[in-house]
Amino acid sequence: TRTDDKPGVNRNMEMQQQQGGFIGHRPRLASFNRASKQLDREKRPVPSGPDPIHHSIPSHAPQHPPSYGKAPYEDDKSIASPGLSNLIGPPPFLDRY
């Protein structure tokens, strides 16, 4: 059985070697990179177009919501301030009377 075990280990080693071969195939990715470079040339103009539009859209969208939110908040504060002061004001007057 021991001798049998030894061959099994050898088989494992062979499998590992195969994996190494697979890594050797990896260089194919390098060739893909070259193709990607060509695509980059086409890609550059594409993003440049949508980029400005996309920028203007987000800039407008965020600006509107904040201003809207601020307006109501300020109104609430101004209303709350006078309301509280009015409520506090009457009691002293009544007391004086």
From Swiss-Prot:
It comes from the Eukaryota. This is CLAVATA3/ESR (CLE)-related protein ESR2-C. GO terms for biological process: cell-cell signaling involved in cell fate commitment. One of its GO terms (cellular component) is apoplast. It comes from Zea mays. GO terms for molecular function: receptor serine/threonine kinase binding. Residues 1-97 are annotated as: Disordered. Glycans are attached at residue 50. Keywords: Developmental protein, Differentiation, Glycoprotein, Hydroxylation, Secreted. Belongs to the CLV3/ESR signal peptide family. The modification Hydroxyproline is found at residues 47, 50.
